[in-house]
C-alpha cells in the first residue's frame, strides 16, 4: 500500500481518535510515580497527563468511553444514567458528603499495624474513588444530557423538564455547599496536612493522605464542573435562586467560580508560605513552592484554565488573582476575615516571598495542557507587579539587606528567561545601583565568599563580566555573585534577547539613563570598589552593545579623575580596566591602536619613573604594581589575539628599554617570562598564517594573511629593538644569569630563524648564526646560560637545516665544544673556600646539574656524536650517566675512533675535528686555577684533561695537537708555582693533581714512545713531572704508603702497553735514583725507607723485573744495605734485592743476567775493601737465591780480597779470609775449590 501523509488534525479530532478504544479510571491527583512513567512530569492518572484538562478546554466529552450504560452505580446504589442527577441532585451530593465524613472518621482509626494499615488504605482509596467518580459523572452528565437553555417558552413543561430547568441553579447551590463543607485547604487539621510529607514511592498510604488528595480533587473538579456548565449554558449566568431567596446574597455560577478560584489560590499561597519559612535565600530558586507534586499540577491547571477563560473575557487573568492575594499579605491582619484568608500562617518577609513565588509560578507557564515542558517565551508576563516589588525592595525606607537583594535579583534574572524584556525594571534597578556603586554588596555570613573582590588581572575582570552574559543558569550564583553582578546579568540578558527578537538594539533606549549618572563629581567620588563596579558595568555594555562608543565615553569619564588623587591601587585597576576593553576589541577583531597607544604612553612614563627611583622603596613598589599590571595585560592581549593583526605591536614600546635595566630578581623574572610568551605566541601565529592555516571559517578574508604578516614584522621589530639589547648586555654579567635569560635568548634565536629580516643590523646578514655565536659558542658567556640556551636549540630540525643550507659545517662541533666547557665549568660559580654550601647554593647546583644532564642527553643525539659513539661501540646506558662520566666516555670514544682509522687523511681530519671539539680547553679551567678552587672544580678540571691526555694520546702525539699538549703540561703540571720548591702548593690543587696524575703520566709516556721529532724534549718533560711530584706525594714513612696510593704507583701498575710502561718505569726509576737515593757523604737521603717501599711496591705489583730496575735501582739498594743500619731500610732493601735476583732468574740468560752480574761485580769492587763483612753477608743471602750468580763472582771476590790486603800492607787478613770462606762454603764445589786454593797459597 502506498504511504500517504495524513492531513493536519484539529486538537479536538486528535483527542477523539486517541480515546476511541481507551477506557480507564477517571483522572485524579496522584503523586505516585512508577517506572513506566516515561519520563513525564506527572502521573499518568493526573488531569494533565490523562488529557482531562485538554478535553474540557476543547469542549469534548470529558469521559467518552465511560457512563454509557443505562444504569450506573454510585455510592452503592443503582441510578438511571441520563436522569439521576436531575432527579436526585440533592440526595447524591448528600451521599457525597457522607462519604467524606466516612473518610474523615477513618483517620481516627489509623494504625501502625501493617495489616490494619493495608485495610485502611484500601477502604480509604475506595471511598476516594467513589467521590471522584461521582464528580466526574456530574461533569459528563452536564456535557451529555443537560439541554442548553431555550430562548422561548413553548407552554406547559413536562415535570422532568421543569426539574431539568431548575437543575443548573440547584447544581450551583450544591457545589457552593460542597465548597463550604470541605472548607479551605489551609484549614485542614495538621495531621491531614502532614500527609504532604509522605514519600511518593510508598505503596500503602494512611487515610489522611487520601482525604488530603480528595480535597484537592474536589477543589479542582468544582472548577471544572462550573466551567463545563458555563460552556453548556452558552455562557449565560446561572443564578442560585433558592439560595438567593433564603439569604438575600447573590450567588451565580460565575461568582462561585471566581470566589472558589480566589479561595483556592489563597490556600495554595498559604501552603507556599509554610514552605517558604524553611527556605534560605541562597536556596530560593532550587527550593520549590509546592509541598507535593499534586499542588504543582493544581497550579498548572489553574494557569491553563484561567488563561483560557481570560481569552474569552470570562474571568480575571491568573496573574491578576495571584497579585491581588499577594498584595493582601503586605497588609497587617486587622480583622478576623483577613486572618482567615491565610489561616494562622504569617509571612515574615512578604516581599521576598512574593518574588519567590512569582518566579516559580512563572516557570509553570512552560507546561502545556498535557503537562509537557515547552521552553518558549511567554506572552503573558507579570512585570508590572514585579516592578512594584522591586521598588519596595530597593526603596530607602525598606532597607533590604544584600542577602535578600541577591535573591530578589536572582528571581528577576530567572524571570528574564520566561518574559520579554522590560525597560522599567532596568531603570528601577539602575537608579538604585548608580547611587551605591561604592558599596561592596557583601553578605557577612557567607564569609570570604561574600566579600567583594577587586579583579587581579584584566582577563579575570573580563571573565567576571562575561559570566554575567552567560545564558545558562548558575546554581551557585547567589554565593558566587553579588546583587550588582546579578543586576548586570539582568541587563545583559534583556539587551541581548531584545536585540535578537526585535532586531532593534535596546542600548539606544537606555544609554542616556546610564550615561547621565556619571559626571565629574560622581567620578571623583568613586572608591576602588566603585571603580571596579564602574568597569564591570561598561565592560558588559561594551560586550553586548556599541563597543567603540562605550569605550570612548569611558575614556572621557576617566579623564574627570584628578591624577594626584588617584591611589596606586586605583591606577592599577584603571589600567586593568583598559586592558579588559582591549581584550574585547581583540575578541571582536577590532583594531586596538588608539587605546593601545594611550596605555603604552602611560607605561613609558611609569617605566622611566621606575628607572630613576632609587631609594624610595614604597614608591618603587607602587610603580611596580602598575608595571606588572601592564605586563600582565599585554600578555593577555597577545594570548587572546588570534592573528596578532590588530596593532598589538603598539603595546611593545621603548618603555621596556628603560624598565629592564631597573629590574631585579622576581621583577626581571616576570618580564622575561612575559617576553618568552610574546615571542612564542608571535612565532606560533606567524607560522600558522604563513602556512595558510586559518582557524574558524574557511571563507576568511583573503587579505588577512598579508595584513597579519605586516603586523608580525612590526611586532618582531619592536621585540628586537626594545628587548634584545638588554639580553645581549646580560650574557657576560658578573653573576650567573637567571634561567629565563637563556630561555628568552633561545626564543630570539628561533625568532631570527622565522623572521630574519627584522633582527638588529649587527646580527645581519645571518642572524641565526650570530645568535649562536653570541649565546651558544662564546667562551666568555656563563655556562649556565649556554647549557640552557643550547638545550632549547640542539634538536631543532629547522635550525640544523638552516646551518646546513648556509654551508656552516661546524655547527655540531662547536656545540660539542660548548658542552665540554659547560661540563668543565659546572663548579665555576661556587666559592673557592671549603665552607658548607647553603640551601640556595645546593638548589642552584642541583638545577644546573639537571640542566647539564639534559644537555648531555641532547648532545649524544647529534649526528656527529652518534657516529663516534657507534664506531667506538659505546653502550646505550652511557647516555643515562651524569655529565662528567658521559664526557669521559665521549673522550674515550673519540680516542678509540681515532685509533681505528687506517688512512692518513682520515686521521688528519679526525685530529682537526677533535681539536675543534676542545677549543681552548685550558681557558675553560683557568678560573679554577686562578682562584685555586673550589676543590670540586679543580678535581673535575684535572681529571677531565687527564682523561684527554691519556685517551687522546695518539691524537696529542701528532704535530697539529702537540702544542696543546705542551700548554697542558705547562699550565696544569709544571706551572711556575710548582717549580718553586720552597713554596707550598694549595691543598685543593695538590689533591686534584694526586687524583689524576696517573692519567697524565700514562698518556705522556705513550706520546714519548710515539713522537720521533720531539722525543727528547717529551722525555725531559716526563722526567720533570716525576721529579716534581714524586716527593710531594711520598709519605714520610712506609707504613703510610698504602693509605693514599701514590699516583705514580697507579700509573706504573695500570694496564698499559709494554713500551709505554717501560718508558714510564725507566723515567720514574731514573728520577728516583738521581734525586731521591743519593747519599750526601755517608748520610742517607731523607725518607729513604718510603722510597724503597715505593720501589718494592712497584716490583710486587708488576711481578717482573726490568733491565732498568737492575741498572738504576739495584746499585743504590745495595749501597743502602751496606751503609744504612736502620732495620727497616735493611729489611726493605733485602726484599728488593730478592725480587730483582728472582726476576733475573725468571729471564734466564741474556742481557738481564749479564747486567746483574755486572752490578754485583761493581758492588764488590766498591765496598769490599771497607765493608767486607757486610758485602760477604749480602752475597751469602744472594747465594741462597742464585748460587750460580755468586759463583760467577768468585774471581772478583778473590781479587778484591787480595787487593784489599795489598792496600793494607799487613799481609793476609785472617778475619777477612774467614768471612770469605764462610761465603764460599755456600757455593758447593766451586766454593770448596776456591777455599783449597786460598789454603794452598797460605801454605
UniProtKB/Swiss-Prot annotation:
This is Protein MMS22-like. Belongs to the MMS22 family. MMS22L subfamily. Component of the MMS22L-TONSL complex, a complex that promotes homologous recombination-mediated repair of double-strand breaks (DSBs) at stalled or collapsed replication forks. The MMS22L-TONSL complex is required to maintain genome integrity during DNA replication. It mediates the assembly of RAD51 filaments on single-stranded DNA (ssDNA): the MMS22L-TONSL complex is recruited to DSBs following histone replacement by histone chaperones and eviction of the replication protein A complex (RPA/RP-A) from DSBs. The keyword Amino-acid biosynthesis does not apply. One of its GO terms (cellular component) is nuclear replication fork. Pfam families: MMS22L_C, MMS22L_N. Keywords: Chromatin regulator, Chromosome, DNA damage, DNA repair, DNA-binding, Nucleus. InterPro entries: MMS22-like, MMS22L_C, MMS22L_N. The keyword Zinc-finger does not apply. Component of the MMS22L-TONSL complex. The gene is MMS22L. Its main location: nucleus. GO terms for biological process: chromatin organization; double-strand break repair via homologous recombination; replication fork processing. GO terms for molecular function: single-stranded DNA binding. It is found in: Nucleus; Chromosome.
Amino acid at each position: 500500500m502506498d504511504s500517504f501523509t495524513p492531513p493536519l488534525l484539529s486538537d479536538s479530532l486528535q483527542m477523539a481518535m486517541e480515546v476511541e478504544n481507551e477506557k480507564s479510571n477517571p483522572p485524579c491527583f496522584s503523586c505516585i510515580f512508577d517506572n513506566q512513567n516515561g519520563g513525564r512530569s506527572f502521573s499518568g492518572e493526573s488531569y494533565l497527563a490523562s488529557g482531562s484538562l485538554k478535553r474540557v478546554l476543547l469542549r469534548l466529552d470529558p469521559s467518552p468511553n465511560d457512563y454509557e450504560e443505562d444504569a450506573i452505580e454510585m455510592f452503592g446504589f443503582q441510578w438511571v444514567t441520563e436522569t439521576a442527577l436531575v432527579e436526585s441532585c440533592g440526595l447524591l451530593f448528600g451521599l457525597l458528603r457522607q462519604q467524606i465524613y466516612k473518610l474523615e472518621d477513618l483517620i481516627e482509626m489509623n494504625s501502625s499495624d501493617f495489616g490494619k494499615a493495608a485495610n485502611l488504605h484500601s477502604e480509604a482509596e475506595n471511598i476516594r474513588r467513589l467521590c471522584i467518580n461521582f464528580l466526574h459523572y456530574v461533569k459528563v452528565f452536564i456535557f451529555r444530557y443537560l439541554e442548553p437553555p431555550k430562548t422561548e417558552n413553548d407552554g406547559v413543561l413536562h415535570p422532568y423538564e421543569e426539574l431539568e430547568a431548575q437543575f443548573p441553579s440547584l447544581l450551583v447551590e450544591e457545589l457552593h455547599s460542597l465548597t463550604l463543607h470541605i472548607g479551605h485547604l489551609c484549614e485542614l487539621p495538621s495531621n491531614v496536612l502532614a500527609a504532604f510529607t509522605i514519600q511518593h514511592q510508598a505503596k500503602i498510604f494512611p487515610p489522611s493522605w487520601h482525604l488530603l488528595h480528595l480535597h484537592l480533587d474536589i477543589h479542582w473538579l468544582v472548577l471544572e464542573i462550573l466551567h463545563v456548565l458555563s460552556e453548556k449554558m452558552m455562557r449565560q449566568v446561572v443564578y442560585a435562586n433558592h439560595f438567593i431567596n433564603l439569604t438575600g446574597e447573590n450567588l451565580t455560577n460565575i461568582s462561585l467560580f471566581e470566589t472558589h478560584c480566589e479561595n483556592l489560590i489563597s490556600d495554595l499561597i498559604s501552603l507556599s508560605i509554610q514552605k517558604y519559612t524553611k527556605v534560605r535565600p541562597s536556596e530560593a530558586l532550587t527550593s520549590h513552592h509546592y509541598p507535593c507534586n499534586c499542588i504543582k499540577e493544581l497550579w498548572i491547571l489553574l494557569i491553563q484554565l484561567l488563561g483560557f477563560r481570560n481569552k474569552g473575557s470570562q474571568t480575571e487573568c491568573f496573574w491578576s488573582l495571584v497579585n491581588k492575594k499577594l498584595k493582601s499579605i503586605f497588609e497587617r491582619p486587622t480583622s478576623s476575615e483577613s486572618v482567615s484568608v491565610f489561616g494562622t500562617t504569617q509571612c515574615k518577609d512578604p516581599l521576598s516571598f512574593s518574588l519567590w513565588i512569582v518566579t516559580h509560578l512563572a516557570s509553570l507557564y512552560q507546561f502545556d495542557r498535557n503537562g509537557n515542558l515547552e521552553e518558549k517565551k511567554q506572552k503573558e508576563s507579570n512585570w508590572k507587579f514585579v516592578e512594584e516589588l522591586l521598588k519596595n525592595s530597593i526603596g530607602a525606607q525598606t532597607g533590604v539587606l544584600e542577602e535578600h537583594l541577591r535573591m530578589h535579583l536572582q528571581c528577576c534574572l530567572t524571570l528574564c528567561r520566561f518574559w520579554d524584556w522590560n525597560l522599567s525594571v532596568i531603570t528601577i534597578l539602575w537608579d538604585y545601583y548608580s547611587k551605591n556603586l561604592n558599596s561592596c554588596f557583601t553578605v557577612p555570613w557567607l564569609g570570604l565568599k561574600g566579600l567583594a573582590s577587586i579583579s587581579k588581572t584584566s582577563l579575570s575582570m573580563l571573565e567576571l563580566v562575561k559570566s554575567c552574559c552567560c545564558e545558562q543558569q548558575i546554581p551557585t550564583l547567589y554565593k558566587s555573585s553579588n546583587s550588582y553582578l546579578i543586576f548586570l546579568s539582568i541587563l545583559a540578558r534583556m539587551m541581548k534577547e531584545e536585540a535578537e527578537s526585535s532586531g532593534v538594539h535596546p542600548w539606544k533606549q537606555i544609554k542616556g539613563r546610564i550615561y547621565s549618572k556619571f559626571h565629574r563629581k560622581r567620578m571623583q567620588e568613586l572608591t576602588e570598589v566603585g571603580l571596579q563596579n564602574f568597569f564591570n558595568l561598561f565592560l558588559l555594555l561594551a560586550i553586548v552593545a556599541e563597543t567603540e562608543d562605550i569605550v570612548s565615553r569611558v575614556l572621557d569619564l576617566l579623564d574627570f579623575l584628578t591624577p594626584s588623587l588617584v591611589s596606586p591601587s586605583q591606577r592599577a585597576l584603571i589600567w586593568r580596566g583598559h586592558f579588559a576593553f582591549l581584550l574585547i576589541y581583540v575578541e571582536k577583531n577590532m583594531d586596538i591602536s588608539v587605546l593601545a597607544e594611550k596605555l603604552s604612553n602611560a607605561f613609558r612614563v611609569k617605566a622611566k619613573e621606575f628607572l630613576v627611583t632609587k631609594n624610595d622603596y614604597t614608591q618603587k613598589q607602587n610603580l611596580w604594581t602598575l608595571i606588572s599590571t601592564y605586563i600582565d595585560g599585554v600578555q593577555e592581549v597577545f594570548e587572546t589575539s588570534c592573528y596578532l593583526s590588530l596593532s598589538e605591536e603598539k603595546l611593545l614600546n621603548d618603555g621596556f628599554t628603560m624598565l629592564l635595566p631597573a629590574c631585579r630578581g622576581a621583577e626581571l623574572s616576570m618580564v622575561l617570562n612575559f617576553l618568552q610568551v610574546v615571542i612564542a605566541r608571535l612565532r606560533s601565529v606567524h607560522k600558522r598564517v604563513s602556512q595558510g592555516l586559518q582557524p574558524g571559517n574557511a571563507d576568511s578574508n583573503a587579505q588577512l594573511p598579508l595584513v597579519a604578516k605586516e603586523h608580525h614584522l612590526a611586532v618582531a621589530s619592536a621585540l628586537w629593538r626594545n628587548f634584545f639589547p638588554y639580553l645581549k648586555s646580560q650574557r657576560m654579567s658578573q653573576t650567573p644569569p637567571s634561567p629565563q635569560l637563556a630561555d628568552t635568548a633561545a626564543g630570539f634565536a628561533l625568532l631570527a630563524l622565522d623572521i630574519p629580516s627584522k633582527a638588529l643590523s649587527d646580527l645581519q646578514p645571518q642572524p641565526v648564526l650570530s645568535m649562536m655565536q653570541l649565546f651558544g659558542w662564546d667562551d666568555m658567556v656563563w655556562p649556565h646560560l649556554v647549557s640552557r640556551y643550547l638545550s632549547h636549540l640542539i634538536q631543532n630540525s629547522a635550525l640544523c637545516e638552516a646551518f646546513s643550507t648556509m654551508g656552516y659545517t661546524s655547527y655540531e662541533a662547536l656545540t660539542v665544544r660548548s658542552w665540554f666547557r659547560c661540563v668543565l665549568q659546572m663548579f665555576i660559580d661556587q666559592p673557592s673556600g671549603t665552607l658548607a654550601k647553603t640551601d640556595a647554593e645546593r638548589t642552584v647546583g642541583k638545577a644546573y646539574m639537571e640542566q647539564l644532564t639534559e644537555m648531555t642527553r641532547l648532545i649524544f643525539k647529534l649526528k656527529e656524536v652518534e657516529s663516534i659513539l657507534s664506531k667506538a661501540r659505546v653502550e646505550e646506558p652511557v647516555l643515562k650517566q651524569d655529565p662528567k662520566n658521559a664526557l669521559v666516555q665521549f673522550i674515550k670514544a673519540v680516542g678509540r675512533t681515532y685509533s681505528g682509522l687506517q688512512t692518513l687523511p682520515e686521521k688528519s681530519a679526525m685530529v682537526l675535528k677533535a681539536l675543534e671539539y676542545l677549543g681552548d680547553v685550558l681557558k675553560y679551567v683557568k678560573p679554577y686555577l686562578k682562584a685555586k678552587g673550589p676543590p670540586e672544580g679543580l678535581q673535575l678540571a684535572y681529571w677531565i684533561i687527564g682523561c684527554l691526555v691519556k685517551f687522546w694520546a695518539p691524537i696529542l702525539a701528532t704535530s697539529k695537537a702537540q702544542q696543546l699538549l705542551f700548554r697542558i703540561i705547562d699550565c696544569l703540571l709544571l706551572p711556575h708555582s710548582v717549580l718553586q720548591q720552597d713554596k707550598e702548593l694549595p691543598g685543593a690543587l695538590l689533591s686534584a693533581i694526586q687524583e689524576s696524575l696517573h692519567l697524565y703520566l700514562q698518556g705522556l709516556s705513550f706520546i714519548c714512545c710515539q713522537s720521533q721529532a720531539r722525543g727528547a724534549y717529551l722525555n725531559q718533560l716526563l722526567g720533570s713531572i716525576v721529579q716534581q711530584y714524586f716527593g710531594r706525594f711520598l709519605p714520610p714513612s712506609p707504613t703510610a704508603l698504602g693509605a693514599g696510593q701514590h699516583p705514580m704507583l697507579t700509573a706504573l701498575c695500570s694496564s698499559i702497553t709494554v713500551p709505554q710502561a717501560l718508558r714510564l718505569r725507566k723515567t720514574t726509576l731514573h728520577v728516583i735514583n738521581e734525586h731521591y737515593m743519593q747519599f750526601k757523604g755517608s748520610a742517607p737521603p731523607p725518607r729513604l725507607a718510603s722510597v724503597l717501599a715505593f720501589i718494592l711496591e712497584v716490583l710486587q705489583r708488576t711481578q717482573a723485573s726490568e733491565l732498568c730496575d737492575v741498572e738504576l735501582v739495584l746499585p743504590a739498594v745495595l749501597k743502602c744495605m751496606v751503609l744504612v743500619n736502620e732495620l727497616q731500610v735493611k729489611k726493605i732493601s733485602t726484599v728488593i734485592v730478592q725480587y730483582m735476583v728472582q726476576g733475573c732468574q725468571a729471564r734466564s740468560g741474556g742481557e738481564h743476567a749479564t747486567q746483574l752480574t755486572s752490578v754485583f761485580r761493581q758492588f764488590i769492587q766498591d765496598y769490599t775493601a771497607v765493608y767486607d763483612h757486610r758485602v760477604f753477608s749480602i752475597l751469602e743471602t744472594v747465594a741462597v737465591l742464585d748460587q750460580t750468580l755468586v759463583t760467577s763472582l768468585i774471581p772478583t771476590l778473590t781479587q778484591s780480597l787480595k787487593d784489599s790486603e795489598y792496600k793494607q800492607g799487613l799481609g793476609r787478613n785472617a778475619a777477612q779470609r774467614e768471612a770469605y770462606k764462610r761465603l764460599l762454603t755456600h757455593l758447593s764445589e766451586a766454593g770448596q775449590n776456591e777455599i783449597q786454593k786460598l789454603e794452598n797459597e797460605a801454605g
